[in-house]
């Protein structure tokens, strides 16, 4: 090395490189503010910020040299990578906060820090503040001082030196309102004046005398304030329509309420030494529930809206009170109710705003039955709230469950539908908010249900499905139709002919393609599984009855190949059947087919009947029916074009054929085709009767107003003076069903002169004077009706008198004396057919003149008249058979009570055992009346049989119900077998009949005999009932639960619990108690039995929730407590045991059922259980299992909230010290200094003015130590591991906080605001003023709390993060 080499200078290359490296190293570590870290204030430098846990590197030669030597001697290793070393600790802590133990430790640290802050910031020195004195001023200076007080620019410190004398009480309030002084400055002025007044009173005389003077002054002040309030309220109400006056009144109210200088001590009675202010007493005129007080309450609620929303329990009370007042206003029938519409609108606006901010506040199961309708009328999106409330409601359970069950709601809407149905039917079904699949499946099942018998159901259902198919995916509706067809597993579930007709109608409307069903049936594999043979046979029948005219030819071949395994379809020859049918039709209807060679006497009823039976209707498939009906209608159209008009007999035969073919569309089209061509009055009248008979079905197909108009125009063309009863009934019925058609019908009738009714024969009836001349008319009736060889001809002749009232009376007189016989039945049949009398008069006559117990076959005769098929027995022609059927339908529709009385009487006669045919006779009517008049069915048939101890009537009723339900109960089987059979066959469509059958099983178990027994012939309808013994009832309940434990019942529908809702109350109570006890005492808790029947028990408990007879809170206290503990342990244990969710749901259901007893009982054990339940439910809410189950968590949260709400409304616990009477009797003062409670003793002027940050720390309010506390509501305290804590209400995100964790003292005195419409309305002013004082104290406390250190701010940020 050359030692003489020059050292690097400023211009050398080496020097420049060294300098550049130094510059680069310094630039590499330039301090820049990080982007994602919030800076903290540097206390050492004003305006600078520092960042936690970040120190920039500063070059130090000594440190570098020492580190280099250390690395050379010991080696170098890369330091461990710490991803958060230059960032906030938030990311590293966030993952740890999910561990429950870490959260507990963090909470302890924060709580400790908060206690330290409270101890550090507590002011211990006495206050030095003194109220400013008052001086005497002239009127001019006093006025100037008040103007300065109204000017916000003038400081209060300047004004405090010259507070004028002479302004107090009413003058003070009037001046504050007149000068429009700001509320805060008006409060300062009032407090200064009041403090000087009280200080002057205390200096006078003895201490006790001073207290009396103070009470007198408070009395005077209170009366003054209340007087101003009353005058302002009256002015506000009177000036409601004037904007300027209304604004002034509102300002006056605001000033009065903010001033709020009313004393709590003035709520005592005047006799006790203190006065009561006018308007705050117990008089009805001062309650806020009256309409006059509501505007004031609305003003208060709006003023303190945000603080109210911060407390969920207060929001809930406010929601209840708002809805209660709205329901009162809507129900109250005031003469000046329109004047209250602004108030109703304001309350409705508050309800909507509260729902948007706190939807959980409207979960009020105890009030939902009374207030739910009001809430749903106001809030549009109320479905979820309704569901949440109904899940917890335990009163009026049957009604609640019906509204909750979407399928039942849809069925009730469909049952009430009548054609022509209006456009609102579809909207009503959509408004149920059921899912799309449920709506379609329910409509289709209703259309083909065996429990419904009306013809129009198929057309109504297809019309609704057509509407549903609009605006949805093209495959959505057909897929649901295919799914429904595949779900039909038995012929007993549906009316198979209606099912075929429904499929045909859906194909006509181009909604359904049969090939889709064929492909789905093949892919399902049902036809190839031997154990599903019954299901496969049903599907093959549906397949063989598809309308092949709507099926492609390739699919037709496939269908015929698939059904060939069934013998009926394997040998089916459609061409041969069509040829036989065509020949029979040519004989029956020669005019339609222009058969000149065959001349048949159509007047012969026997020939007509014989020929009609030659048509093999029973052998037809649905496709054959369609072909035959279309060929027949085509032939009729061709015949009408040739000028053919059928006679009455021919059209009656034509109608009968189409009715047997179920071709209702073609029948309606045929009537529309023939009416304009009709020139015969008899035919026109018959067509009118046919239209009236099938009105409901035709109204779904045709334009009924147009058809009725055609009838009337055709009638006018006949130029008849009198109107036939058939046409007149059609006109009257059309006017009722089509109100828009009524004016036109009246016009048509007026233009045709005054209409008069005429008999069938068109012969003018005799006058009254002519009829009264024949005094031997009863004897003539005997000769004509009883001794005549041809009763039909005699009745035709007597038809001339059918409009004569004298003849009707004579006929009833003659019938009253006749004995029951077959000849009398034949006579009555023809009298009804030819309208000589009506079924209503005959039935009413027999019920009046015969005792219900000794009619000697009268009921059987009448039932034969109104129900039995007598066509073959009396050789009725087609027109006669139709007339009789038409009269029966009118009687059943218009007089169901008489019909039911006849059926009830027949149940009490022993002939029912030898005459099973009557079951088929009354089947259709009983199903109709059970659907549309269930209460009447129970009143006239069920109750007279179940209540008395009559085995004959009970057995008859059971036969009837078995026939209607297609069951076989009570024929030598046990109660267990009967119950299992009934429970498995119940559906939403036969629920009422199944409920009646279950009542009968329990009421007459063991007393129903298949053999006839002697019956009581006493005139009374009822017999003294005998109440079953308790042992028998318990045995029956045990049998029921053994049946429920059967593994085959686990897949029962969710509505099967409704089956038990009509049982007697005592029996329902025993079933409910057994269900609860079975669950709570199960060895496999929370499971019950090997197959876990908890889901069945939940359904059973839900349906019987309003039938409590045994308080399990007292009888099963230990089981409830231990069961809840086991549920809590299972919810935090991994893995979770099976059936835990069902167990929690069942426990919640039991808790809600016994809510009143659990929350209001003063028993020591129940009180301990209550605390344990509230705490246990909170623990379940915090458990990981519930957190992963949203639906269960929502139900648990609603239940816990409902229990807490009920807990806040019950009486105080016995161990709490009684507080003084008045609005603060349920408030306690919790001191954070000594951790103790005391009574609230806040005085009116304990706080004189707002704290001023520029004043000294001790220049604060008087008695400041009092506000080192929190005002709490008196509620029970939960104990856990020796630590005292309180459960604070929350919404769905409810939380549990320990005392002292909240840095701000927000008073629960806000509860006085929602109570302003509650039971404490007499003293709502005191609540409000007390709230103001406490809020002032809270602000002072928050001012002192601002001295917190940066460490405490960090702790608060960690708390927010948690």
Swiss-Prot record:
GO molecular function: transcription coregulator activity
Any one GO cellular component localisation term in the record: mediator complex
Primary localization: nucleus
UniProt record, GO biological process: regulation of transcription by RNA polymerase II
Keywords, alphabetical: Activator, Nucleus, Repressor, Transcription, Transcription regulation
Location(s), subcellular: Nucleus
InterPro entries: Mediator_Med12 (IPR019035)
Region described as Disordered: spans on this chain: 31-51
Similarity section: Belongs to the Mediator complex subunit 12 family.
Function comment: Component of the SRB8-11 complex. The SRB8-11 complex is a regulatory module of the Mediator complex which is itself involved in regulation of basal and activated RNA polymerase II-dependent transcription. The SRB8-11 complex may be involved in the transcriptional repression of a subset of genes regulated by Mediator. It may inhibit the association of the Mediator complex with RNA polymerase II to form the holoenzyme complex.
Subunit structure: Component of the SRB8-11 complex, which itself associates with the Mediator complex.
Protein name: Mediator of RNA polymerase II transcription subunit 12
């Amino acid at each position: 090395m050359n030692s003489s080499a020059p050292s690097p200078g400023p211009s050398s290359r080496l020097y420049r490189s060294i300098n550049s490296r130094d510059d680069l190293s310094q630039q590499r570590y330039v301090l820049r503010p990080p982007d994602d870290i919030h800076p903290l204030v540097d206390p050492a430098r004003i305006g600078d910020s520092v960042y936690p846990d970040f120190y920039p590197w500063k070059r130090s030669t000594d440190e570098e040299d020492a580190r280099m030597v250390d690395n050379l001697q010991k080696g170098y290793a890369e330091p461990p990578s710490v991803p958060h070393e230059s960032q906030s600790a938030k990311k590293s802590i966030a993952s740890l906060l999910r561990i429950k133990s870490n959260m507990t430790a963090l909470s302890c640290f924060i709580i400790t820090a908060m206690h330290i802050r409270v101890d550090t910031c507590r002011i211990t020195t006495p206050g030095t503040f003194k109220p400013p004195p008052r001086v005497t001023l002239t009127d001019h200076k006093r006025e100037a001082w008040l103007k300065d007080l109204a000017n916000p620019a003038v400081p209060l410190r300047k004004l405090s030196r010259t507070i004028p004398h002479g302004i107090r009480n009413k003058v003070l309030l009037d001046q504050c309102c007149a000068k429009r002084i700001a509320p805060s400055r008006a409060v300062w002025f009032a407090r200064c004046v009041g403090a000087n007044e009280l200080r002057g009173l205390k200096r006078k005389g003895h201490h006790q005398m001073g207290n009396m003077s103070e009470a007198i002054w408070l009395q005077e002040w209170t009366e003054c304030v209340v007087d101003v309030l009353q005058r302002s309220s009256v002015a506000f109400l009177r000036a409601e329509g004037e904007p300027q006056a209304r604004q002034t009144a509102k300002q006056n109210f605001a000033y009065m309420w903010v001033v709020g200088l009313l004393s709590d001590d003035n709520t005592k009675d005047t006799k006790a030494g203190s006065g009561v202010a006018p308007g705050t007493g117990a008089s009805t005129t001062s309650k806020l529930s009256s309409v006059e007080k509501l505007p004031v309450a609305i003003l208060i609620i709006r003023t303190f809206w945000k603080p109210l929303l911060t407390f969920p329990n207060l929001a809930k009370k406010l929601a209840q009170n708002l809805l209660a007042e709205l329901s009162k206003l809507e129900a109250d029938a005031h003469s000046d109710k329109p004047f209250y519409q602004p108030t109703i609108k304001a309350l409705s606006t508050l309800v909507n705003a509260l729902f948007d901010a706190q939807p959980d506040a409207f979960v009020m199961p105890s009030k939902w039955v009374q207030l739910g309708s009001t809430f749903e009328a106001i809030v549009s999106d109320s479905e979820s709230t309704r569901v949440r409330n109904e899940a917890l409601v335990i009163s009026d359970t049957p009604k609640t469950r019906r509204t909750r069950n979407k399928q039942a709601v849809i069925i009730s809407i469909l049952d009430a539908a009548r054609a022509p149905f209006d456009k609102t039917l579809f909207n009503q079904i959509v408004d149920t908010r059921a899912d799309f699949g449920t709506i379609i499946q329910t409509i289709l099942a209703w259309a083909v249900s065996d429990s419904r018998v009306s013809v129009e159901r198929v057309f109504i259902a297809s019309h609704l499905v057509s509407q549903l198919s609009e605006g949805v995916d093209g495959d959505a509706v057909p897929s649901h139709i295919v799914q429904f067809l595949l779900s039909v597993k038995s012929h007993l579930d549906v009316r198979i002919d209606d099912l075929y007709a429904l499929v045909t109608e859906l194909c006509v409307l181009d909604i359904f393609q049969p090939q889709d069903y064929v492909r789905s049936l093949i892919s399902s594999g049902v036809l190839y599984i031997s154990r599903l043979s019954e299901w496969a046979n049903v599907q093959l029948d549906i397949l063989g009855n598809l309308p092949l005219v709507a099926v492609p030819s390739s699919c037709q071949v496939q269908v015929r190949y698939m059904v060939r395994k069934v013998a009926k379809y394997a040998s089916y020859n459609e061409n041969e059947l069509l040829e036989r049918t065509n020949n029979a039709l040519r004989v029956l209807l020669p005019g339609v087919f222009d058969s000149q060679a065959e001349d048949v006497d159509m007047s012969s009823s026997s020939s007509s009947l014989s020929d009609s039976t030659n048509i093999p209707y029973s052998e037809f498939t649905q496709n054959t029916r369609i072909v035959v009906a279309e060929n027949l209608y085509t032939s009729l159209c061709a015949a009408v074009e040739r000028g053919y008009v059928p006679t009455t007999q021919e059209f009656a035969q034509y109608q009968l054929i189409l009715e047997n073919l179920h071709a209702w569309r073609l029948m309606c089209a045929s009537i529309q085709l023939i009416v304009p061509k009709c020139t015969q009055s008899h035919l026109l009248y018959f067509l009118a009767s046919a239209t009236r008979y099938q009105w409901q079905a035709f109204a779904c197909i045709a334009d009924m107003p147009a058809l009725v108009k055609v009838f009337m125009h055709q009638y006018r063309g006949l130029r008849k003076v009198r109107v036939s009863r058939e046409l007149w009934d059609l006109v009257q019925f059309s006017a009722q069903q089509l109100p828009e058609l009524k004016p036109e019908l009246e016009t048509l009738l007026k233009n045709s002169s005054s209409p008069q009714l005429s008999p069938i024969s068109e012969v003018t009836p005799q006058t009254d004077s002519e009829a009264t001349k024949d005094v031997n008319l009863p004897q003539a009736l005997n000769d004509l009706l009883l001794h005549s060889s041809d009763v039909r001809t005699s009745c035709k002749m007597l038809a001339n008198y059918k409009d004569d009232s004298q003849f009707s009376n004579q006929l009833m007189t003659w019938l009253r004396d006749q004995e029951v016989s077959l000849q009398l039945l034949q006579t009555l049949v023809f009298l009804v057919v030819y309208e000589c009398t009506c079924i209503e008069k005959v039935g009413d006559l027999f019920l009046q003149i015969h005792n219900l117990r000794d009619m000697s076959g009268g009921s059987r005769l009448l039932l034969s008249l109104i129900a039995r098929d007598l066509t073959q027995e009396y050789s009725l022609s087609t027109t006669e058979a139709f007339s009789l059927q038409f009269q029966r339908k009118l009687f059943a529709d218009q007089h169901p009570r008489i019909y039911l009385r006849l059926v009830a009487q027949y149940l009490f006669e022993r002939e029912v055992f030898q005459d099973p045919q009557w079951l088929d006779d009354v089947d259709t009517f009983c199903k109709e009346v059970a659907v549309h008049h269930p209460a009447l069915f129970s009143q006239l048939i069920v109750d007279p049989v179940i209540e008395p101890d009559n085995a004959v009537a009970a057995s008859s009723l059971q036969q009837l119900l078995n026939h209607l339900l297609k069951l076989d109960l009570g024929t030598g089987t046990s109660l267990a077998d009967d119950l299992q059979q009934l429970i498995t066959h119940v559906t939403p469509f036969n629920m009422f009949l199944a409920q009646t059958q279950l009542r009968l099983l329990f009421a007459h178990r063991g007393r129903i005999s298949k053999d006839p027994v002697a019956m009581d012939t006493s005139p009374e309808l009822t017999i003294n009932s005998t109440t079953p013994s308790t042992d028998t009832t318990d045995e029956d309940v045990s049998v029921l639960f053994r049946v429920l434990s059967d593994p085959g019942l686990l897949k029962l529908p969710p509505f099967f619990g409704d089956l038990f809702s009509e049982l007697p109350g005592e029996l329902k109570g025993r079933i409910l108690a057994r269900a609860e006890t079975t669950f709570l005492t199960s060895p496999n808790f929370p499971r019950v039995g090997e197959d876990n029947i908890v889901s069945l028990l939940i359904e059973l408990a839900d349906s019987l929730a309003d039938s409590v007879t045994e308080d399990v809170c007292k009888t099963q206290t230990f089981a409830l407590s231990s069961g809840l503990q086991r549920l809590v342990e299972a919810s935090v244990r991994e893995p979770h045991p099976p059936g835990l969710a069902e167990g929690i749901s069942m426990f919640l259901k039991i808790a809600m059922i016994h809510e009143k007893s659990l929350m209001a009982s003063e028993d020591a054990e129940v009180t301990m259980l209550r605390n344990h339940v509230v705490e246990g439910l909170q623990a379940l809410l915090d458990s990981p299992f519930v957190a992963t189950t949203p639906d269960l968590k929502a139900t648990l949260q609603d239940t816990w909230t409902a229990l807490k709400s009920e807990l806040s409304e019950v009486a105080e616990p016995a161990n709490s010290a009684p507080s003084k009477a008045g609005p603060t009797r349920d408030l306690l003062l919790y001191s954070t200094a000594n951790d103790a409670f005391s009574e609230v003793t806040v005085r009116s002027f304990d706080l004189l003015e707002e704290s001023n940050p520029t004043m000294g720390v001790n220049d604060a309010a008087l008695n400041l130590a009092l506000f080192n506390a929190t005002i709490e509501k008196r509620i029970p305290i939960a104990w856990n591991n020796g630590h005292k804590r309180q459960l604070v209400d929350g919404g769905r995100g409810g939380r549990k906080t320990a005392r002292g964790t909240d840095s701000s003292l927000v008073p629960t005195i806000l509860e006085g605001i929602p109570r302003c419409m509650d039971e404490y309305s007499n003293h709502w002013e005191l609540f409000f003023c007390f709230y103001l004082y406490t809020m002032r104290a809270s602000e002072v406390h928050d001012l002192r709390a601002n001295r917190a250190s940066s460490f405490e701010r960090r702790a608060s940020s960690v708390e927010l993060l948690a």
